[in-house]
Amino acid sequence: MTQEGQLEKRFLDYLHSERNYSEHTSTAYENDLSDFRRFLNEQAIIEYQQVTFLDVRIYLTELKQKSFSRTTVARKISSLRSFYTFLLRENVITENPFTYVSHAKNQLRLPKFFYSEEMEALFQVVYEDNETLTLRDRVILEVLYGTGIRVSECAGIMLSDLDTSYQAILIRGKGNKERYVPFGAYAEDAITDYLSGRIELMTRFKKTHDSLLINHYGDPLTTRGIRYCLTKIISKASLTRKIHPHMLRHTFATDLLNNGADMRTVQELLGHASLSSTQIYTHVTKEHLKSTYMKHHPRA
């Protein structure tokens, strides 16, 4: 491994062990470093210590010419700034060339959410029969919409994480932070109806694990597997616009705020470290109110 490769590995290990970053986040940093290393090779720059402010400006220009979104450019620069801050702390460099690099302010991108009639169409799909895998899909949909957890968090649910007496689930979120989220009667009924079929399927394939969600071989259902299940549900519901599974989380937050929930509670339920991450949903509700007004009021 080259010296530069060793520096990258030390940084990624630091993110994982000391900052408790998730594998998904660490992978994003690794990809950003890889892209920057490609750029440096093209510029015949061998060592990270050789990078100057001018080199950074050239790289920033290249990113913009490749039509990356402002959000992507901002993330890449943030990743590299963090990397060079780490190198500075480790006394590998004496000055961070990313310190004074600015980028265009991120555009406000409002989260997309499902409308009530779309949610009804999705639920119709998972309530059409009581086959074990349909019951599992029902659990996925009821839990994701009923709790607002991330798809990756849903994949990590163990039977031991379920507290049926309080109707709550122990969730391990980003940075391995734990939180309890409540779930309602629909999710509870879905889980209860599914568990006997889960046991039968696992017994058939001689599986012995604690994961709540399983695939057709009785193995734990992965994040990718849940996304695949949701994609099939969405397809069967014949929804016309372009949508994605994460919209269930957006819908959960939007529906809570539309029905009077306070911002701090929604923040806790979503597992957001910062209130600013939650406040984006107030823009969604305002836009929805305005759209409804403009569409239906005779003097709009």
UniProtKB/Swiss-Prot annotation:
Core-binding (CB) domain segment(s): 2-88
Function: Site-specific tyrosine recombinase, which acts by catalyzing the cutting and rejoining of the recombining DNA molecules. The XerC-XerD complex is essential to convert dimers of the bacterial chromosome into monomers to permit their segregation at cell division. It also contributes to the segregational stability of plasmids.
Gene3D superfamilies per the UniProt record, alphabetical: 1.10.150.130, Intergrase catalytic core
InterPro entries, per the entry: CB, DNA_brk_join_enz, Integrase-like_cat_sf, Integrase_catalytic, Integrase_recombinase_N, Integrase_SAM-like_N, Recomb_XerC, Tyrosine_recombinase_XerC/XerD
GO MF annotation terms: DNA binding; tyrosine-based site-specific recombinase activity
Keywords: Cell cycle, Cell division, Chromosome partition, Cytoplasm, DNA integration, DNA recombination, DNA-binding
Domain of life: Bacteria
Family to which this protein belongs: Belongs to the 'phage' integrase family. XerC subfamily.
One Pfam family recorded for the sequence: Phage_int_SAM_1
Example of a GO biological process term: chromosome segregation
Taxonomic classification: Bacteria, Bacillati, Bacillota, Bacilli, Bacillales
Key word Cell inner membrane present: no
The protein's assembly and partners: Forms a cyclic heterotetrameric complex composed of two molecules of XerC and two molecules of XerD.
GO cellular component: cytoplasm
Statement: the UniProt record of this protein carries the keyword Signal: no
SUPFAM superfamilies registered for this protein in UniProt: DNA breaking-rejoining enzymes
Subcellular location: Cytoplasm
Domain Tyr recombinase: 109-294
Residues at the catalytic site: R150, K174, H246, R249, H272, Y281
The protein's name: Tyrosine recombinase XerC
